[in-house]
Amino acid sequence: MAEPRRALAQMDDARISVGNARFLIIEAPYYEDIAAQLRAGAEAALTRAQARFDVVSVPGALEIPIALAIALDRAPALYQGAIALGCIIRGETYHFEIVANESARALTQLVVERKLPFGNGILTVETETQALERASVESGDKGGDAARAALALYRFSQEFGQVVEQAQIQAQRPVLTSGAR
């Protein structure tokens, strides 16, 4: 099987420096050792990009979307991006599908509606071994990938805003025609 392209892992965090932008990391440390690795990767990527960040914890992955909604409602201008971190390991019941699908659906809906740069670092795996491999900063670094995704979207929003401003300025300039009568 071919190795997936690791575009996010290969990004130079310093190249996507975001100055004083502030990001919110919301973690669900249900599996503490996995959460610690995810958080370490996310914090390292944000630090290299010179971003400021806060970390809050909630009991589980289903609580991450409501925590993000509360944070955005209570402090709408405080955060320029967010990162969700957690781990859902398949068990013997349908609970895995509910938690995985509903947390992803709610987060996607929220960040699209709010147009918030976001990185989803909630692992959905079959085993704890898979989770540890993906979370480890040395191997999978999915926490770092989630932070880099949020950083890249933040940069995109800033750069696209500049493109739009330039286009609007160009559109307002009078058109000079030659040969006027």
From Swiss-Prot:
Keyword hit for Transferase: yes
Signal peptide range: none
Catalysed transformations (reactions): (2S)-2-hydroxy-3-oxobutyl phosphate + 5-amino-6-(D-ribitylamino)uracil = 6,7-dimethyl-8-(1-D-ribityl)lumazine + phosphate + 2 H2O + H(+)
Active site: H95
Positions annotated to bind (2S)-2-hydroxy-3-oxobutyl phosphate: E92, T93, R134
GO CC annotations, alphabetized: cytosol; riboflavin synthase complex
GO BP: riboflavin biosynthetic process
DNA-binding recorded as keyword: no
Pathway listed: Cofactor biosynthesis; riboflavin biosynthesis; riboflavin from 2-hydroxy-3-oxobutyl phosphate and 5-amino-6-(D-ribitylamino)uracil: step 1/2
Gene Ontology molecular function: 6,7-dimethyl-8-ribityllumazine synthase activity
Primary role: Catalyzes the formation of 6,7-dimethyl-8-ribityllumazine by condensation of 5-amino-6-(D-ribitylamino)uracil with 3,4-dihydroxy-2-butanone 4-phosphate. This is the penultimate step in the biosynthesis of riboflavin.
Protein's name in the database: 6,7-dimethyl-8-ribityllumazine synthase
Taxonomic lineage from the root: Bacteria, Pseudomonadati, Pseudomonadota, Alphaproteobacteria, Hyphomicrobiales
Annotated gene: ribH
